[in-house]
Amino acid sequence: MIDINYDFPSNRPARYFDKLETSFTFNKLNPSPIGTRFVATQFWLDPTNGTGGGDTMYIGINPTVQSYNYVGQAHFSYFGKNAGQLYNSNCNKGADGGSGVTCALNLPTTQGYTYHLTVNLVESTAQHAVLSGTVDVLNATGDPVQTVEIGKFEILRGNMALSFPASWVEGSSDPCASLVKTGITFSPLIVTYFNTGGTDKYTSPINTVPSNKCGVNATPVGVRMDYGR
């Protein structure tokens, strides 16, 4: 596991957004990238009254693994007991064997491509929240390839917003010596603060890469990750 934290200074709190944008570029990606199972940004669906007790969510990319015919997917998931209506056929009730929602879109990954993922809090009322997750795929020259909704669903909790984002690379049980060379650029996170009509945005740079299992070279290009051999 490689963890990535973002910089939120005191005048830019890390909570209460209605939009979150995160981007990953696969600079070096083997057709069967041993040790790279999931590249994602995790965050909370958080009560806006400050009481805490929010629910975990994430959005991310599972790279293609040709060695066992896995095409690759984009995921948008909610972990909690308050799932409501599902508005996209990519979505199903349940998340990692527990309660929640998992939306999965078949999406092959390509070396050199960027995957720009957006979470929108479409609606937040006293009764519920509606959220959507989309992916914009850009080719190696930055030209758009496609834009697809990963999923859209309702959460039966009122007065909620997005908070406390962090990113990570989920590895595998393979020994460190067997990892193949992988290079990923994590771009700065873009958030839009809740109830500002889309006008109050903050671009949050990478702060730290606090933990990793097998060693990683991190350089400030966004943050570019190189690991394996």
Report each predicted region and the residues it spans.
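Secretory/extracellular carbohydrate-interaction modules
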Residues: 1-88, 101-104, 195-203, 210-216, ...
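A generic structural signal for short, solvent-exposed coil/turn residues
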Residues: 14, 68, 125-127, 159
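Extracellular Ig-like/FN3 beta-sandwich strand-entry sites
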Residues: 17, 112-114, 128
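Residues within well-ordered beta-strands of beta-sheet-rich folds
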Residues: 21-25, 114-120, 132-134
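Short beta-strand segments enriched in hydrophobic/aromatic residues
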Residues: 24-28, 121-123, 137, 171
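Aromatic-enriched hydrophobic runs in primary sequence
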Residues: 78-82, 93-97, 115-117, 179-191
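Short, aromatic/His-centered strand-loop micro-motif at the edge of beta-sheets
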Residues: 89-116, 124
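Aromatic sugar-binding interfaces of carbohydrate-active proteins
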Residues: 127-229
